[in-house]
Amino acid sequence: NHHEHEHEHEHEHEHEHEHEHSNEEQTCSEQNPIINRTHLSSVASTVGWICWNGLNFDAELVSKWLSNLSQLPGVIRTKAVLRTNEGWWSFNFVDRKEELRPNGYRRDSRIEVIIEGKDVPDVQSLEQELQTCLV
């Protein structure tokens, strides 16, 4: 019986995962402008945010922030597509290499930090830093 329960739980989890994408599109709004999506795994974890597209990031500040993040111990890379005061930009920081490119319009801004193992930085304080990058 215990085994069955586990199986059901796994199934539910997979089910949620499949539909995660459509759910998260609706939850980003003026009332709830920044949503955290953290996924922990022993191999590599991701800490990410989805930001309502009414938010405008300061391109220079957010670029510095992402660059600093990418150099934290354990961080493999940071990437983002953000609406900035200079239009939509995609950012990619890995091994001190930076790629910044103009990007087309998106429904929302997204940030993803990829980290080795489960030892992730404090998500709440990162989110506060992120908010200081808003215009």
Which stretches of residues belong to each language-model region?
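Flexible loop/N-cap segments at domain edges
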Residues: 113
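C-terminal accessory "lid"/substrate-recognition subdomains
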Residues: 1-109, 118-135
